């Protein structure tokens, strides 16, 4: 257990020092390395880490958070960075596909890379880190309880995410209209909220272990959106909310493929199989 914790800590530190912030720096393209070298990346099950070759983080651009870049509040264990940290992962002979990755609670911009590189081996991956830190873990917005969230903060972070991503797309000449957005848990929730608040941004999305987080929101025009939701049938806390999210997206006209797999809240091979089938 100590060894695993030590490895995870080193990888988290490596990701933090090799990433940059929206509108700053040029992330360095990276190469795919051996399976063994990719095993320490967090965010998915051990079985998938064993079988997936993953991009090496490489040298990249060092961007350390300064005190002036973090807003703190009187609340205990809460802070917010002023920028979103991001990193590109581009394999050799990359296709024109762009996959935007939003991690779950406690993750970072590298967390979903093993999963995504397995499904889209030639795509350019854009991993983004949520800028909220609460109770020692990274998040996309402030939570009140595990299933109740600060409504003002959800909207604040969704709007900030869209503004920053749009600016980055303009600078890097990225075509977001053909991008696939992949979110897990907290990241999937932020992505779903973003779709409701900014319906023109996301045209294709994968939402894993997600739930609706906005209490009152107008029905958005999602007629051009395709969405895959993946729920773990053993995910006792969050699976009961999945039908409500699918219904909300469908009410806006989105084409939703709602799937339930034999899994808990953690990700694994069945998620990769479901997504691969959906994108085929």
Task: Pin down the residues of each PLM region.
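A conserved short beta-strand
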Residues: 201-212
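Alpha/beta-hydrolase fold nucleophile elbow
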Residues: 174-183
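Short beta-strand/loop motif that positions the catalytic acidic residue
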Residues: 228-231
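Acidic catalytic loop of the alpha/beta-hydrolase fold
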Residues: 233-239
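Serine-hydrolase catalytic machinery in alpha/beta-hydrolase-like enzymes
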Residues: 78-174
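A domain-start/cap signature at the N-terminus of enzymes
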Residues: 25-98
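C-terminal catalytic histidine-bearing segment of alpha/beta-hydrolase fold enzymes
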Residues: 240, 246, 250, 255-280
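Gly/Ala-rich beta-loop-alpha elbow adjacent to hydrolase catalytic centers
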Residues: 182-187, 191
């Amino acid at each position: 257990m100590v060894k695993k914790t030590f490895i995870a800590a080193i990888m988290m530190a490596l990701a933090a020092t090799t990433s940059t912030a929206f509108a700053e720096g040029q992330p360095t393209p990276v190469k795919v390395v051996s399976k063994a070298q990719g095993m320490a990346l967090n965010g998915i099950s051990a079985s998938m880490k064993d079988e997936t070759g993953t991009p090496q983080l490489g040298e990249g651009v060092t961007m350390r958070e300064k005190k002036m870049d973090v807003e703190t509040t009187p609340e205990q264990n809460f802070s917010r960075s002023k920028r979103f940290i991001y990193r590109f992962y581009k394999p050799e002979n990359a296709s024109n596909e762009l996959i935007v990755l939003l991690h779950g609670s406690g993750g970072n911009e590298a967390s979903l890379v093993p999963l995504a590189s397995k499904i889209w081996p030639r795509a350019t991956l854009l991993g983004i880190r949520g800028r909220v830190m609460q109770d020692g873990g990274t998040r996309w917005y402030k939570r009140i309880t595990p299933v109740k969230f600060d409504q003002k903060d959800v909207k604040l972070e969704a709007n900030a995410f869209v503004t920053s991503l749009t600016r980055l797309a303009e600078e890097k000449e990225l075509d977001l209209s053909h991008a696939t957005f992949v979110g897990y848990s907290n990241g999937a929730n932020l992505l779903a909220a973003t779709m409701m608040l900014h319906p023109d941004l996301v045209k294709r999305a994968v939402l894993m272990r997600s739930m609706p987080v906005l209490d009152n929101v107008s029905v958005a025009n999602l007629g051009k959106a395709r969405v895959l939701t993946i729920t773990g049938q053993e995910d006792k806390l969050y699976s009961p909310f999945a039908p409500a999210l699918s219904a909300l997206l469908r009410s806006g006209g989105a084409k939703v493929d709602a799937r339930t797999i034999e899994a808990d809240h953690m990700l694994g091979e069945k998620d990769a199989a479901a997504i691969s089938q959906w994108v085929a």
